[in-house]
Amino acid sequence: MNIKNSRARNALMMWCGVVLHDTKCALFRILIFCTGCTVLVGPIQGAEISQTIETVKASVVGVGTFQQSRSPAMSFVGTGFIVDDGFHVITNAHVIPKILDSEHMETIGIVIGKGDDTEFRPAVIVAEDAEHDLALLKISGAPLPALKLGDSGLAKEGQSFIFTGFPLGMALGLHRATHHAMLAAITPVVMPALDSRKLDVKMIAQLRKSPFSIFQLDGTAYPGNSGSPLYDPETGVVYGVINMVFVKGLKETAITQPSGISYAIPANFARDLLRQKTQ
């Protein structure tokens, strides 16, 4: 680049943050601190992510129960998301209540809508995978927009994801919130116990098997996020299902003093569960 006009050269330096190392050389060696590039790219990426989130939110639902004699009649404690044909929902197994008040016709289902404009859709349990903390529901009514389950084996440590759900369930109402998370590690599901007295029956059972791998995330999730889709911010493809957080001390501190460490079940286990609907 041969710049003869010093004014033009100075203007270029001011605009692009260019440091010229040798003004006598025909081809200048330059060091560019050009923030203009990030200004151009940033908003485009932000717009793409915003569009992805809006698309995904249409498939994210609350998972809970309905009981006419109860106030409020609708109650949800976790999150789920629509997959496959628009009639199936993936969530965590621990979100599904083990006992229903059948005497008062309590029903499992999903909650859709936003804010005060909500609708309850009854659902039935199609399949459940307690080992991987997953459940598959089938809803009635019209189909809803479905998300695609990706190959979680392709996920890499350091990859950025986002997840959408209802962090505190009913406490914040039916307002979907989205959070960033980085895949910090792919680790065995059984976390080491420094004290053998802290091992429970479930942990011992897992240790006797070959522990499957789980996604450890550098991101803050809350109890109501259980069942939230963990997805690619550009494509919306789901690679995991949020299922637990690392708790420091008592369970209550998961809300008041979150550790910032969350976990997700790889989506391949959800894909396996989905295949059971046709068996």
Residue ranges and their predicted role:
Residues 104-110, 115-123, 157-162, 176-200:
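Beta-strand/loop subdomains of soluble extracytoplasmic proteins
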